[in-house]
Every structure is written in C-alpha cells, then in structure tokens.
Amino acid sequence: MEVFDINGQIISPLAGKTLYVAGDSIAYGKSSAGGYGKCIADKYGMTLTNEAVDGATLTPNITDKVYGGTRGCISTVVTNSTALAKADYILLEGGVNDAWNNAPVGTLTDGFAAAYDETTMTGALEKMLDDLATNH
C-alpha cells in the first residue's frame, strides 16, 4: 500500500536514496523517457545514476551483427564506475544483445568457487555479480 503526503506525493522509504542502473538499451531507456530506472527514481523520489550503454553485452568482445564492432560490456561499466560506491540500490539488466549476437550461454560454476568463463553469458554474469558482492 502506498502512502501519500498532502500534495499527493508518495511517502517512501526510498525517498532520498540513490539508485544505480547499468545494462543495455533497455536499462538506458533508448525507446522511452529515460528507462525504467528513471520511472522508479521519479516515482519514489530517488536520485538516479544511469550508466547503461545502448547495445552493451554481458559477454566481453561480442561483435554486434547489425552495427559491427563491440558496443560496450556491462561488467566493464560496473567495474569502472565511481558512482556505484554511492548507490543504495543497484539494478542490473543485460543479456538481450548477447542472445541477439549468438553469445554462448555457458554453465554455472559450483558456488562461485571455480574460474569463470567470461567468454559465455553465464560466466560473465557470475564474474560481475561476484565482483559486486566482494566490492560493494
């Protein structure tokens, strides 16, 4: 249930918090007014940092079959972000461009204990999540 103030604004425990978003064009908001992160931040009075990249992939070095070349790697954005340390909430999205460009799916490691095969979507995602858990 949402609670509103006298001006009709939602009173939320998220108000004043920082939302960090990384991902591809879906997170970037290419075909909407700033993406779902902006919708969430605006609705709940949050500060938004959106470092999503149009065309980005989970798997490094995937050649885009439409545009050619690589268009950015989500884990690289996350790893190099200075804004991430200030985030209260993190939203990550990806995999669409990997699938579109036929990146190998891969298999899960056993409990984040093995080496990650970052040439696969699964390995790249595991590595990124492990880095996030370790560093943030």
Predicted regions and their residues:
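Exposed low-complexity, polar/acidic, P/S/T/G-rich flexible segments that act as propeptides
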Residues: 1-12
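Short linear motifs in intrinsically disordered/low-complexity regions
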Residues: 6-8, 25, 132
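Conserved SGNH/GDSL esterase-like catalytic core that processes O-acyl groups on lipids
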Residues: 18-20, 26-126
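A structural motif corresponding to the C-terminal end of an alpha-helix
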Residues: 127-136
